Amino acid sequence: QPMANEDGSLVIVFNGEIYNFQELRSELEAKGYKFHCGADTESLLHGYEEWGEAVLDRLRGMYAFVIWDKKKNKLFGARDIFGIKPLYYYPMADAGDGAPGVLFGSEIKSFLDYPHFHKAVNKKALRPYMTLQYSATEETFFEGVYKLPPAHYFTVDIPTGKMNIERYWDCDYSAVEKPFEEYVDELDEVVHESVEAHRIADVKVASFL
């Protein structure tokens, strides 16, 4: 990584794992897309190429990624629905060349060496942390650095630097009246199916007691 598509119009950086990438790959191959490796990154990249931002509705996994869409001159980034993989961002009015920009990464320390990153303590983030002993807000201890919430995506218009953040998934907590035994059977089925989906790997899978 970074990985680009065939004409170089899309470039992706990706951290995580897409559990259903093989199904996505088969669907995309049927549409004429060519694959050059067995990585889930390529399925994600071509998925965006085909479905745009709606690719998020098809993903199953843990992920944080950003795609540079050169044709639309924008960035598109997203985080998985449970927030397993982190994604931090730092909007800049001046990225050093007089134009706006944004830093992004899975760790804040990747920002530290950038010459136009302003290192300052965010005092507003200290109070909730001292109270709850974990960071409960989108703000971080660095002023101006934020974490993208779970189940959210952002777009950045590169010429203007305008950033838009949207939620793409939410849980439905509506109660459904069913016999207790039916709930047990459904839960058992979901757990087994989830474990099976997580077993996809390039090496043998083991479990530690």
Label every model-predicted segment.
Residues Q1-L209:
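Cysteine-centered catalytic environments shared across enzyme families
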